[in-house]
């Protein structure tokens, strides 16, 4: 069994991005810029945004956080996005989810200029992803693919099982695997017999937020197991996979923490650089 070390790879990617940012500044006078919209007082959201801002600072990307109260109106968020769309110093716009219940999240995400949609949530970019075209892909599944590439894992011809069908992780994860010619099975809350699907899989990617959902008896020998789940159990952060027992059967597995999580932020930085380069070309 080999650990897919996202922490180590994310550091390597950040070092490469830092050099790229320095070259962009020196040769083309471009400073990539990221705007983050943060609504409400959710502690987890505030933690994630701080981590993203710190990562930007570490590599030389300019970032600005627009903090808004929980009571903010739909119109006020829309106006802020419109302003960021027009701002020539901003290459990427990120809305930290979840938004308060009175806000129409779909409408908010659709307002972001697709050329600045570094989270890859806009329907335009999602459509391009489904067609296998170059686009911004959501950062978490993109990070998974980068991790597989780093360890020389080619998914072509593999049976893949994606557990979870969210727009943020499950669906784009399935699309990215399909674009690499894996045969993809998508499971969700209404899947009748989850084990029936996971047992056939050469690669399992799970992200639903349920500790120990995937147990050793649900995984075939030498399977590749990608744990995208993040759950707090007591004082520990764990994934959706029973790591201790599944790791005895898997050929490769991601730990939680230190697997997919660090890759998500690394891909956000990568997408922001991509947006900055495209802005320069256009």
From Swiss-Prot:
It catalyses: (6R)-5,10-methylene-5,6,7,8-tetrahydrofolate + NADP(+) = (6R)-5,10-methenyltetrahydrofolate + NADPH; (6R)-5,10-methenyltetrahydrofolate + H2O = (6R)-10-formyltetrahydrofolate + H(+). Disulfide bonds: none annotated. The keyword Iron-sulfur does not apply. InterPro entries: Aminoacid_DH-like_N_sf, NAD(P)-bd_dom_sf, THF_DH/CycHdrlase, THF_DH/CycHdrlase_cat_dom, THF_DH/CycHdrlase_CS, THF_DH/CycHdrlase_NAD-bd_dom. Keywords: Amino-acid biosynthesis, Histidine biosynthesis, Hydrolase, Methionine biosynthesis, Multifunctional enzyme, NADP, One-carbon metabolism, Oxidoreductase, Purine biosynthesis. Transmembrane segments: none annotated. Its EC number is 1.5.1.5, 3.5.4.9. GO terms for cellular component: cytosol. Pathway: One-carbon metabolism; tetrahydrofolate interconversion. GO terms for molecular function: methenyltetrahydrofolate cyclohydrolase activity; methylenetetrahydrofolate dehydrogenase (NADP+) activity. GO terms for biological process: L-histidine biosynthetic process; methionine biosynthetic process; purine nucleotide biosynthetic process; tetrahydrofolate interconversion. NADP(+) binds at residues 164-166, 189, 230. The keyword Signal does not apply. Belongs to the tetrahydrofolate dehydrogenase/cyclohydrolase family. Homodimer. Catalyzes the oxidation of 5,10-methylenetetrahydrofolate to 5,10-methenyltetrahydrofolate and then the hydrolysis of 5,10-methenyltetrahydrofolate to 10-formyltetrahydrofolate. HAMAP family: THF_DHG_CYH. PANTHER family: C-1-TETRAHYDROFOLATE SYNTHASE, CYTOPLASMIC, C-1-TETRAHYDROFOLATE SYNTHASE, CYTOPLASMIC-RELATED. This is Bifunctional protein FolD.
């Amino acid at each position: 069994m080999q650990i897919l070390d996202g922490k180590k790879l994310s550091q390597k990617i950040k070092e490469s991005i830092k050099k790229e940012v320095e070259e962009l500044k020196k040769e083309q006078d471009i400073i990539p810029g990221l705007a983050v919209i943060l609504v409400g007082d959710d502690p987890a959201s505030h933690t994630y945004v701080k981590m993203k801002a710190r990562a930007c600072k570490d590599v030389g990307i300019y970032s600005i956080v627009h903090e808004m109260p929980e009571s903010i109106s739909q119109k006020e968020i829309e106006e802020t996005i419109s302003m960021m769309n027009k701002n020539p110093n901003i290459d990427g716009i990120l809305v930290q989810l979840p938004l308060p219940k009175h806000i129409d999240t779909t409408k908010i995400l659709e307002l972001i200029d697709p050329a600045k949609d570094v989270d890859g949530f806009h329907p335009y970019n999602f459509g391009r992803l489904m067609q296998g075209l170059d686009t911004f892909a959501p950062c978490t599944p993109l990070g998974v693919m980068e991790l597989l590439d780093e360890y020389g894992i080619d998914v072509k011809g593999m049976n893949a099982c994606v557990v979870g069908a969210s727009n943020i992780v499950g669906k784009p994860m399935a699309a990215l695997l399909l674009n690499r010619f894996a045969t993809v099975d998508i499971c969700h809350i209404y899947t009748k017999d989850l084990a029936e699907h996971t047992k056939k899989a050469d690669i399992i990617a799970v992200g639903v937020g349920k500790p120990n959902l995937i147990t050793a008896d649900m995984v075939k020998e030498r399977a590749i197991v990608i744990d995208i789940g993040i759950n707090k159990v007591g004082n520990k952060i764990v994934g959706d996979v029973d790591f201790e027992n599944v790791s005895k059967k898997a050929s490769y597995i991601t730990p939680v923490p230190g697997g997919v999580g660090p890759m998500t932020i690394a891909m956000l930085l990568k997408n922001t650089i991509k947006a900055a380069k495209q802005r320069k070309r256009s």
